[in-house]
Regions:
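Non-heme di-metal
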Residues: 2-132
């Protein structure tokens, strides 16, 4: 049997901090579907930002250029690529793969949250607009 992965070790070390986040008072303030919609309409940008930070780390810690050459610390490369794999292409219920961001956006649609702002933001990025 294979040993515990670096990602699993990281998750275990972060378990107490994750518990603090999950128990944050903001979640207790979400009492209605409308509360959830409003929360998600803002929180979706944090989900997007996390993915952007993750991809920046991947770019800085690994080689994403052509031609490829080994770059960075081996364990760091493995850890960041494991996280990217899970965040960018997690297994979807019923088969297939989906990013956590896309999953969150789909949940927003399902609960009736307004996705127009995040969709406009993404479209502006696709067109190359600077967000500064």
């Amino acid at each position: 049997m294979k040993g515990i992965s670096s990602l699993e070790r990281l998750r275990e070390s972060l378990r107490p901090l994750r518990a603090q986040v999950v128990q944050h008072k903001v979640y207790g303030a979400i009492e209605t579907l409308e509360d959830l919609r409003i929360f998600m309409e803002h929180h979706v940008f944090a989900v997007w930002d996390f993915m952007s930070l993750l991809k920046a780390l991947q770019r800085d810690l690994t080689c994403v250029e052509i031609p490829w050459v080994p770059q960075g610390h081996r364990l760091s490369r493995r850890l960041i690529n494991e996280i990217v794999l899970e965040e960018e292409s997690d297994e979807e219920t019923g088969g297939g793969y989906i990013s956590h961001f896309e999953l969150y956006r789909a949940a927003m649609e399902q609960c009736g949250a307004d996705i127009s702002r995040v969709d406009s933001f993404l479209e502006a990025l696709r067109r190359g607009n600077d967000m500064d």
